[in-house]
Design a protein with these regions (language model features):
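Active-site cores of enzymes that catalyze phosphoryl transfer or operate on phosphate-rich substrates
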Residues: 1-3
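DNA-dependent DNA polymerase catalytic subunits
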Residues: 6, 14-48, 57-320
């Protein structure tokens, strides 16, 4: 309980934040269209968030930085932000404070990063190839990832690293280089133990989905289904003293199985390692795991830029 709790206050804060960021977005677009003489034809704001705007300065670079090195272009953009954009934003905030009858302006926006490439997959899902961070020039570009599977704990660790490597290739190399990388990783992936490629999850609602006759009920989440199958098989094999049952709230891993396996189920979960007594290693569905853990997350990115993860045969190539 909080003395000053009031939904109206929360709503007012949220609405004010949305209004402020949209106000700055409109003002920045207006300013850049005027300076670059695009007469309101271009939207220079790629995206905005609660307290951030992402500004595309490609037209400015094209007009003023022909023949310049990447280092010189970055220096130029930094100077533009410091001497033009930030003072303009400060002026706009003062105007907004006056408009809203604020006691004084308390809003400030500073440049965070300069990136030479960026890809937006969806709202709040993007990646930036950062070359300058808060005025500090980076010796090597640094990936800033938001909402991408490479930073999600639900993705296997090995795939998180490889997704980051693939994004680096997308940011700096050619599509054919990505094809080679994916093909090589697929070979490596099929040699990895099941524990390395399984999905990590937290297991909840075991009692809700358990069925004494059929192990699990229809509609059971796949990782819970795998956990119930695991507990059933531990009991069937008499392994209770060697392997603990999966309990409510346990951190587990689950992995897909090919259909032709002794358990007749398409998934199995476990706590730390797959019991050798189950003799399921040869039935691990590496193809599906590769699709779900690596290719599916990559497809969102590749669709946004029109790339493929492997070479596509064309009619021209077929007929030589």
């Amino acid at each position: 309980y909080f003395r000053y709790y009031d939904v109206r206050q929360a709503s007012g804060i949220t609405t004010a934040g949305q209004f402020i960021i949209r106000f700055i977005e409109d003002k920045m677009n207006e300013y850049l269209n005027k300076v670059l003489q695009t007469q309101g034809q271009k939207d220079y704001i790629v995206a905005s968030d609660t307290d951030s705007i992402y500004v595309c300065l490609d037209k400015l670079v094209e007009k003023t930085c022909k023949g310049k090195t990447n280092e010189q272009i970055t220096d130029f953009i930094g100077r533009v932000c410091d001497s033009r954009l930030e003072p303009y934003i400060e002026k706009c905030f003062a105007e907004l404070a006056d408009y809203s009858n604020a006691f004084k302006n308390a809003m400030v926006m500073k440049r965070e990063v300069i990136a030479n490439k960026g890809i937006w997959v969806a709202k709040k899902r993007y990646m930036l190839n950062v070359i300058d961070e808060e005025g500090i020039r980076l010796s090597e570009p640094k990936l800033k990832l938001m909402g991408i599977e490479a930073v999600k704990s639900s993705t296997p660790q090995v795939c998180r690293g490889k997704i980051k490597d693939a994004i680096k290739i997308i940011m700096s190399k050619k599509e054919s280089d990505l094809h080679d990388f994916v093909a090589e990783f697929k070979k490596e992936f099929k040699e990895l133990p099941p524990e390395a490629i399984a999905f990590p999850r937290s297991c909840n609602n075991l009692r809700k989905y358990r069925d004494n006759a059929n192990i699990f009920i229809k509609g059971t989440p796949i990782h819970v289904k795998g956990a119930l199958i695991y507990n059933h098989q531990v009991k069937e094999f008499g392994l209770q003293n060697k392997f603990p049952y999966i309990q409510e709230g346990d951190k587990i891993k689950f992995i897909k199985l090919v259909e032709a396996n002794p358990f007749k189920f398409d998934v199995i979960s476990y706590i730390t390692s797959l019991p050798t007594e189950f003799k399921l290693k040869q039935y691990v569905d590496y193809e599906t795991q590769f699709e779900k853990t690596f290719l599916d997350p990559m497809r969102f990115i590749l669709q946004a830029i029109g790339w493929e993860h492997e070479p596509k045969a064309s009619l021209e190539a077929f007929f030589g």
